[in-house]
């Protein structure tokens, strides 16, 4: 398969870096059905936390529920960070077809959207980071206190309830046109979400031998696990552009930060300034002291010969990821097919 150059136009140079982003001429809003569905996906897992606390207050949390929650959190979380993000979005490495499929399925069970839309939105975010065109910048409403607070809410959650479509044809043409396996998995997203809830229930029922055990596993390893992973991911979009350190140089107006407190829960994604300084690098934590479980897993895949062409070090000025003549170019190595 021939690699597809993924080059996106950047924002015109007129943006001053502090003003609110221009509003669309005719602001679009999500319809009733999308809003209702989004609300259910976002609110139901969060409400389950209240049910979980109520149950824990009376009878405690079983070791089975906690272990299942950790297992499903790790599997689906790494599916997002290693699969959706570093493999499919940035092509930080190539993987055997079966491993690509496993990671894509695991990421799809995180309730964060189908993989093609996820990839398209994230590539658009990198093309227009913290400037007009960025789908989830906390600086959307300017850099004043009120604007930042409103932007933080938008970047974390509010953007999910607006309708600013990101074209997969523009930002993920490689997956749409040349990757039938990923296209099938993307279309199976509703079924994989159902499996993400049913599997914890089935496991809890099988291990405990009771329907109650299945129900508590459904709450802790299903709904609460989903809520925690969602908010950790969204915190990278919001907090990791506003709070933390910026030790590495990124593109103009890019305010991505490193936030150590989220490193473990986000599997290394919160080393966001390091990531934005070199997006195609498989390691986001740029020093040995910066824990990056996603990079460790990619390294394991490489040692097992399940992954190759791993991009560990920042490239030179002629490297794969660069900004040239006002355009943002993503690494275009071709996924291995055998």
PLM region descriptions:
Residues 1, 275-276:
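Short conserved micro-motifs at the rims of enzyme active sites and ligand-binding pockets
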Residues 1-234, 239, 281-338:
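Non-catalytic, topology-defining segments of multipass membrane proteins
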Residues 172-180, 245-271, 278:
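Active-site-proximal inter-transmembrane loops
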């Amino acid at each position: 398969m021939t690699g597809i150059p993924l080059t996106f136009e950047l924002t015109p140079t007129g943006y001053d870096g502090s003003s609110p982003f221009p509003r669309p001429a005719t602001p679009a809003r999500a319809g009733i059905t999308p809003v209702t569905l989004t609300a259910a996906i976002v609110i139901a897992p969060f409400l389950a936390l209240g049910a979980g606390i109520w149950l824990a207050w009376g009878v405690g949390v079983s070791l089975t529920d906690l272990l299942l929650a950790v297992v499903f959190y790790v599997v689906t979380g790494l599916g997002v960070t290693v699969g959706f993000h570093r493999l499919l979005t940035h092509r930080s490495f190539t993987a055997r077809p079966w491993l690509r499929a496993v990671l894509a399925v695991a990421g799809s069970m995180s309730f964060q959207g189908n993989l093609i839309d996820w990839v398209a939105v994230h590539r658009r975010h990198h093309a227009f980071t913290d400037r007009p065109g960025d789908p989830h910048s906390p600086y959307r409403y300017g850099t004043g206190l009120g604007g930042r607070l409103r932007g933080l809410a938008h970047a974390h959650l509010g953007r999910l309830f607006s309708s600013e479509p990101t074209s997969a044809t523009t930002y993920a043409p490689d997956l749409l046109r040349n990757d039938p396996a990923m296209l099938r998995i993307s279309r199976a997203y509703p079924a994989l979400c159902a499996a993400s809830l049913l599997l914890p229930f089935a496991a809890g029922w099988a291990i405990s031998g009771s329907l109650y055990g299945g129900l508590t596993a459904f709450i802790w390893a299903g709904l609460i696990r989903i809520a925690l992973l969602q908010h950790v991911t969204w915190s990278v979009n919001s907090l990791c552009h506003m709070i933390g350190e910026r030790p590495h140089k990124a593109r103009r107006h890019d305010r991505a930060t490193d936030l150590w407190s989220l490193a473990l829960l986000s599997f290394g994604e919160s080393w966001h300034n390091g990531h934005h300084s070199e997006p195609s690098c498989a390691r986001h934590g740029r020093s040995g002291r910066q824990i990056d479980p996603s990079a460790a897993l990619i390294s394991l895949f490489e040692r097992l010969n399940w992954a190759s062409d791993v991009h560990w070090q920042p490239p030179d000025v002629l490297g794969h990821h660069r900004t040239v003549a006002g355009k943002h170019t993503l690494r275009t190595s071709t996924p291995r097919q055998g």
